[in-house]
Structure formats: C-alpha cells, structure tokens
C-alpha cells in the first residue's frame, strides 16, 4: 500500500476481543497496528451490542462524515447500545485473559468436532478464531440438521448458497470465553449425534 500511496483499511468485525494482545484485534495479532490508516468493526460480535465504529485520522473521519451515503443517511445508535459496547470493552480491558481462554476453547472444540467425525473446513482447523464451520454440503440437509440441533438446545447458524459455493453448505458454530469444556462436550455430542443420523 505504501508503495502506491494507498491507505490501509482493516475491517475487523471478527478480530476485536478475539485476536491480538488482550483481544486488540487483527492488526495487533499480525504486529501491524502502526500501519493501519482506517480501522473499523462492529459492536455486534464480541461487544454484545449493535452498531459499529471507525477509527482514522481527522482528515479521513471528516471525509466519511460528509461523503459516505450510508453514514449520512443513518441514525446514531441508541445510548443503551453504546453503553453496552463500552462496558464490554472495559471488561475486556480488565480481563485480558479472556481472549486466550476463548482461543483455548476454540482449539478444544475443533479437536472435539473432528474426533466426533465431523468435517471442518481445512482452513479453519488451525485458525485462532471462535467460529468453526462444519460442512453439511447439501442445503436442505443443512436446514434439517440445524433445526434438529436447535430443538435439542444448541444453536448453530446454517450457512447456505449464495453465502457458500453450491454443494458446500455448512453449520457455523461460534464459541464464547464463558463456555466450559463440559458445555462444549454436551453441545458437540448433540451435533455429532444429529449429523450421524442425517
């Protein structure tokens, strides 16, 4: 980017609270925090709220305020949602061990799912993130399996074409630092049992 005079923007929807030192995000994870010009993300993932944020130089922020149609024609988030995101961020700052706990649980889940014979996207096997896709392949099978797993008390997100290539539908599973190994074992047993019958 520097070679061509371009700005570097990181859309870190899934990195904040998960990756990097103390959960500071993707740029921290790769040691590139000082090279990012525009850093943006969402409050709806690790901060348990809604809305989003953008951090940039005053020049870039001013440009976005006056030229970005989505920004111009949207309303501010409600104060309660802003307070929720701030409280979650403060908790993350006070408990920098939470992202490491989340990474450990994610690795535990990856091993547990594969030990139960489930097919995980190869690129996700070693990923340090708490989103683990389980292949189900066929669209209607994916919907049936997701519904049955839900009926047994576990939420998984069915992801279907066009979000995935045709024939590569999957169940997207997500994890939290407050989960326990016992809870994950129970959920993985349910997922494994339902998938084995389908």
Language-model features: locations:
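A short glycine-threonine-serine/GTX helix/turn-capping micro-motif
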Residues: 68-77
């Amino acid at each position: 980017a520097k070679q061509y005079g371009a700005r570097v923007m990181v859309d870190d929807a899934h990195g904040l609270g998960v990756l990097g030192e103390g959960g500071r995000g993707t740029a921290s994870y790769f040691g590139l925090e000082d090279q990012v010009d525009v850093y943006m993300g969402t409050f709806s993932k690790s901060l348990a709220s809604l809305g989003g944020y953008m951090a940039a130089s005053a020049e870039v922020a001013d440009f976005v305020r006056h030229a970005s149609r989505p920004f111009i024609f949207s309303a501010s988030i409600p104060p309660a949602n802003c307070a929720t995101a701030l409280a979650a961020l403060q908790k993350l700052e006070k408990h920098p061990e939470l992202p490491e706990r989340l990474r450990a649980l994610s690795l535990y889940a990856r091993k547990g799912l594969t030990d139960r014979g489930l097919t995980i996207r190869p690129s996700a096997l070693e990923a340090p993130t708490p989103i683990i896709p389980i292949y189900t392949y066929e669209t209607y099978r994916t919907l049936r399996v997701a519904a049955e797993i839900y009926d047994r008390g576990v939420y998984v997100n069915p992801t279907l074409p066009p979000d995935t290539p045709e024939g590569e539908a999957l169940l997207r599973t997500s994890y939290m630092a407050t989960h326990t190994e016992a809870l994950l074992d129970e959920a993985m047993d349910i997922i494994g049992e339902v998938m084995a019958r389908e």
